[in-house]
Amino acid sequence: MRAEEQSKIREAAAGTIFLLIGTVCFASKSIWIKWAYQMGAEPDAVLLYRQLLAVPLFWLIFLIYRPPMPDGKKKGDLWKACGAGVFCFFLSPLLDFIGLNHVSAMVERILLMSYPLFVFGFTACRDRKMSSIQDLFAVLAVMFGLFLALGGWNAELFQANMIGAVFILLSSAVYAGYLVLSGHLVHQIGGIRLNAYGMTAAGAAMMLYTGIKSAAGMNTPMAAYPLSMYGLFAVIAVVTTVIPFVLMLEGIKRIGAQRAAAISMAGPILTIFYGALFLGERLGLIQVIGCGGVFFVITGMEYRKLKTGKKE
């Protein structure tokens, strides 16, 4: 085997390993957050410390990589990146973290998978295009799967999950709106620059949000936590946020975005496994059927999009 071929094999193997580790780390996010909640942290505090710890690390990544500015960039693009960051890194996670306080990590991960459903709806409205029968069937199948995942006809279980589900579905909708309206910014200014500016804006928005809540008398404990809690905050910021970004970035460089997306689809399955192993969470049979249905339909939609090279 020639040296060039061996080099390509090593690159592909390294890229796959990077992506697998990144997916494993990112999939554990809900588990660490759940542990923080069990130790007494509030959703606002978890998100605030995640932002404060992640922002300088994203700027460090920016300085290390020093990505060149893409051609044709406009001055307003950086401001758009900040605006996009408020939605993608502040509002969407805030709704998700609040919702996760009311549902299991398993259910939360499946609900977050619904974002392609919102992307589909927003794109159809934007482009004013009629959907195909196949797409409409997929939408109805996902909606029915989500209904089952929340408890289906078990009224008590369904009601217990409803509050959290509303927040998490809103989080998915906000993220989908970001993808439809601002997804092109990744190509215009680059993913590293978008994350640095966006996360900075999100951190500022989070501090403003907590300040407004404090002024309104809705104080959330932000300090006086035990040392172990700050360790959890650091893990959430570094292990489940920054490290996955770097590993996926390096993995995509080596094996391409399509193969990377295929590997990352294992994330929801890993979260469900973590929830059962580390949190002792369990799903009823109806919920398992619903989660499985949502996973396979959404995965099928994403695979078809990857195969056809379709972009929103």
UniProtKB/Swiss-Prot annotation:
Pfam families: EamA
GO cellular component, one term: membrane
Main location: membrane
Start and end residues of each EamA domain: 173-303
Transmembrane segments: 13-33, 45-65, 81-101, 105-125, 133-153, 162-182, 198-218, 229-249, 260-280, 283-303
Intracellular or extracellular location(s): Cell membrane
Membrane topology field: Multi-pass membrane protein
UniProt entry keywords in alphabetical sequence: Cell membrane, Membrane, Transmembrane, Transmembrane helix, Transport
PANTHER family: EAMA DOMAIN-CONTAINING PROTEIN (PTHR42920:SF5), OS03G0707200 PROTEIN-RELATED (PTHR42920)
Family of this protein: Belongs to the EamA transporter family.
Record's protein name: Uncharacterized transporter YcbK
Gene: ycbK
